């Protein structure tokens, strides 16, 4: 059974529907893998063993439903997404005992598709980070090298997929938090277009930037997951009415003939380590061999300008969103507070970690009367310029190809006290969130045994093209080895 946990979603689905494997034994195999590897990687905050096995037994007693693409398949979920009667902590002391009374919209979609929620994965506290080191429940470790970070903030989701603890995991992406950990863990990471997937029931970090998406081991699996998740939700006012596709069926292209790929010159800079630049350039050459035409383009505001813009807008929105955690309505409540003001101060001081407090303070500062025009208003203007840059280059190409991370996974603890250094690791990812565009991270090689990813950037609501091109490239790129766990 051990080999079955290495199968794709489509493969394990076929075995379950045909009754060649029972849902219970597949679920138990994933739980056994979690038990064996969790002491090493700490990918989960909550493991839903009892609930998952109970649901598996129910499904085994029912008639398999081939129309449900995730029927009987164990899926992991990032722990900032609400799950009814299952703790949802956002990896924070503030919510360590919080149990939601309803499911997020995307959890409903997973269940409607037949999925089994096997557990809630670790993350940077309130999804604020790039390494999954700021979690109240301890850091997650990279399955490829457990001395290194898995990336973040969806590091637990990426590590769980890379370690074969589940068949897919859901993450959220505010500035690269699906794509970057997927790249550092050798997985596929898809950030859909803003509005493609509902945010209802996701604990908000930055509402105009947040987007949920899948982390998988193949592009085909990402297409299956997106087909499940991408539905209009009237509970989310930013949820798109645009029609969605069966993204899996649409993976028809065999080569890249007729495709024009844009190469933004700003993404080839001193920020990127030379071995990663080599892999990126090899990916460009591979695309050409597969029939693509490449052209050099410019996105003048999409790197250094984007970092500053992102950290102003994201922290401003975080300051507003996290104001609700005050020790009164729900969440951590400090004891021995004699006044309401003391209760607020003590609850938030003890309930939030250092990085969350840093971002709240920064966001409050840029929204203050004296600094709003110079910071937040100016950042909103630059955000518009970033979007215009992308709209301009997409008149000349079908898709963009860039690096994901300027470096491979770094050693745990090496940058935790260097916030500016950590922020700059998002330099190739944040511009997509500011522009609301879809991005796909795929493995492209190894450097000293650590995975390197490349990023495909698509036009708004054209995930079909993004996945189709990514599927072709993934078959010719990336590590063929697996983490040695």
From Swiss-Prot:
One of its GO terms (molecular function) is ATP binding. It comes from the Bacteria. InterPro entries: Amidase, Amidase_CS, Amidase_dom, AS_sf, GatA. It is an enzyme of class 6 (ligase). GO terms for cellular component: glutamyl-tRNA(Gln) amidotransferase complex. Allows the formation of correctly charged Gln-tRNA(Gln) through the transamidation of misacylated Glu-tRNA(Gln) in organisms which lack glutaminyl-tRNA synthetase. The reaction takes place in the presence of glutamine and ATP through an activated gamma-phospho-Glu-tRNA(Gln). Heterotrimer of A, B and C subunits. This is Glutamyl-tRNA(Gln) amidotransferase subunit A. The gene is gatA.
